[in-house]
């Protein structure tokens, strides 16, 4: 895996970099595990915008990823490593011994031809999935469930990893990529290793058009809008907004705490630090 730079033949090539991913083995997805992705353009059924800065972009097919890893005890061989346009991580196609095929997130070090397995009796090897109760303390894991059987919700993006710090009766203590330490039930599944595609964060997009290819539309500051569009809008000439920073809907922003989920507060041992 390497970052490719370009000679500045055009102004945007001067700053643009590209990820050269030698570990990818095919450019065609396994068709039965794909699904049409319906674009919304950030709009709901009434047609009005509900999410800003979305629209356009290249057509994509959804890859159906196995986040549950619930095929217990059946060994599988890694057949391909593939690009997935819907996430920062790459994906690996598994061929199970009983003939079934599934996609999983591709961890660092997992090669084509290697065997993986999931279940409580699996070995502590990269790509294997086990309940947290069977994973030794200090192990690096990814693709972690928050509720047993629901499917993984944490540590799924490129380069993400969490560390199993300790186990206390029914709960395991995990240090998450954000820096937060959290209790998770020991019956939740996790996959051994770190998510691959580590250089993803080092890619420089280089030009506005490339962002548009990704389906992201331009962002405007509130102070350059009219008062009808944003609380910071309006004023004669250039203004600073005249008040503390707020969202378009008037909620304080830039460091203002908005978390409101007291039900799960008891599971957070250490809050994440400031970036």
From Swiss-Prot:
SMART domains the record matches = Ribosomal_L2, Ribosomal_L2_C
Where is composition skewed (Basic residues) in this entry?
Answer: 31-42
Span list, region Disordered: 24-48, 224-264
| Residue intervals passing through the bilayer | none
The record's annotation in HAMAP family points to:
Ribosomal_uL2_B
Q: Describe the function of this protein.
A: One of the primary rRNA binding proteins. Required for association of the 30S and 50S subunits to form the 70S ribosome, for tRNA binding and peptide bond formation. It has been suggested to have peptidyltransferase activity; this is somewhat controversial. Makes several contacts with the 16S rRNA in the 70S ribosome.
Q: Cite the entry's keywords alphabetically.
A: Ribonucleoprotein, Ribosomal protein, RNA-binding, rRNA-binding
Concerning InterPro entries, the annotation shows: NA-bd_OB-fold, Rib_uL2_dom2, Ribosomal_uL2, Ribosomal_uL2_bac/org-type, Ribosomal_uL2_C, Ribosomal_uL2_CS, Ribosomal_uL2_dom3, Ribosomal_uL2_RNA-bd_dom
Q: Name one GO molecular function term.
A: structural constituent of ribosome
Q: Which organism is it from?
A: Koribacter versatilis (strain Ellin345)
High-level lineage: Bacteria, Pseudomonadati, Acidobacteriota, Terriglobia, Terriglobales
Indicate what this protein is called per its UniProt record.
Large ribosomal subunit protein uL2
Superkingdom of origin: Bacteria
Family membership: Belongs to the universal ribosomal protein uL2 family.
């Amino acid at each position: 895996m390497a970052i490719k730079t370009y000679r500045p033949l055009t102004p945007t090539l001067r700053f643009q970099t590209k990820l050269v991913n030698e570990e990818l083995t095919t450019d065609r997805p396994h068709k039965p595990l794909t699904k049409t992705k319906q674009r919304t353009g950030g709009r709901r059924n009434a047609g009005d915008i509900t999410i800003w800065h979305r629209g356009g972009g290249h057509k994509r097919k959804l890859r159906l990823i196995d986040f549950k890893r619930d095929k217990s005890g059946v060994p599988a061989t890694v057949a391909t490593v593939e690009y997935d346009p819907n996430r920062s991580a790459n994906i690996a196609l598994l061929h199970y011994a009983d003939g079934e095929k599934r996609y999983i997130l591709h961890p660092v070090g997992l090669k084509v031809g290697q065997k993986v397995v999931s279940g409580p009796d699996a070995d502590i090897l990269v790509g294997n999935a086990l309940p947290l109760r069977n994973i030794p303390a200090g192990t690096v894991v990814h693709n972690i469930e928050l509720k047993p059987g629901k499917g993984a919700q944490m540590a799924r993006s490129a380069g993400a990893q969490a560390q199993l710090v300790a186990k206390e009766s029914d709960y395991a203590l995990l240090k998450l990529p954000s820096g937060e330490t959290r209790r998770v039930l020991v019956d939740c599944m996790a996959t051994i290793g770190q998510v691959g595609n580590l250089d993803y964060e080092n890619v420089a997009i280089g030009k506005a058009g490339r962002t548009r290819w990704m389906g992201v539309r331009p962002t405007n500051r509130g102070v350059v809008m009219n008062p009808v569009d944003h609380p910071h809008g309006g004023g004669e000439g250039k203004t600073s907004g005249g008040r503390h920073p707020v969202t378009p809907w008037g909620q304080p922003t830039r460091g203002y705490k908005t978390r409101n989920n007291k039900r799960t507060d008891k599971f957070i041992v250490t809050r994440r630090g400031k970036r």
